[in-house]
Amino acid sequence: MTPDVLKNIADTLEARREAAPQSSYVASLFHKGEDAILKKVAEEAAETLMASKDKDKLHLVREVADLWFHTMVLLTYHGLRPEDVVMELHRREGISGLDEKASRKPTA
C-alpha cells in the first residue's frame, strides 16, 4: 500500500461530504452526523478486537481496514486528513511513550 491510497480515499471522502445522502454509503453517514459516524467507528473497533481474539489474521486485516476507513470518515467530518495524523506520528517518533503522554496538556 502506498500513501497515495490514503490520499485517494481522503479525496473521495471529502467529495462525498457534501453529496446527497442517497448517492453513497459515506454521504449517508455524513448526513446522519457525528453520532452515526462514532457508532460505526466503535462497531468496527469492536469487530477488530473480536478478530484479534479469534486469531484470524485475514479477518483481522479486513476489520482493521474497516476501522481505518471509518476513522478516516470521522477525520473528514472534522475537516482533517490522514496527513494530520501522520504529522502527529512524526512528532512523536523517537519520544518515549511515557514522556509523550506526560507532555500533553490536560483537557477539560
Curated annotation (Swiss-Prot):
Classification via PANTHER family: HISTIDINE BIOSYNTHESIS BIFUNCTIONAL PROTEIN, HISTIDINE BIOSYNTHESIS BIFUNCTIONAL PROTEIN HISIE
GO molecular function terms listed in the Swiss-Prot or TrEMBL record: ATP binding; phosphoribosyl-ATP diphosphatase activity
Major subcellular location class: cytoplasm
Domain of life: Bacteria
Gene Ontology cellular component annotations, sorted alphabetically: cytoplasm
Keywords: Amino-acid biosynthesis, ATP-binding, Cytoplasm, Histidine biosynthesis, Hydrolase, Nucleotide-binding
NCBIfam families: histidine_hisI, PRK00400.1-3
Family affiliation: Belongs to the PRA-PH family.
Enzyme Commission identifier(s): 3.6.1.31
The protein's annotated pathway: Amino-acid biosynthesis; L-histidine biosynthesis; L-histidine from 5-phospho-alpha-D-ribose 1-diphosphate: step 2/9
HAMAP family, per the entry: HisE
Organism per entry: Chromobacterium violaceum (strain ATCC 12472 / DSM 30191 / JCM 1249 / CCUG 213 / NBRC 12614 / NCIMB 9131 / NCTC 9757 / MK)
One matching Pfam family: PRA-PH
Gene assigned in the entry: hisE
Subcellular location: Cytoplasm
Protein name per UniProt: Phosphoribosyl-ATP pyrophosphatase
Protein's GO biological process: L-histidine biosynthetic process
Reactions listed under catalytic activity: 1-(5-phospho-beta-D-ribosyl)-ATP + H2O = 1-(5-phospho-beta-D-ribosyl)-5'-AMP + diphosphate + H(+)
Keyword Nucleotide-binding: yes
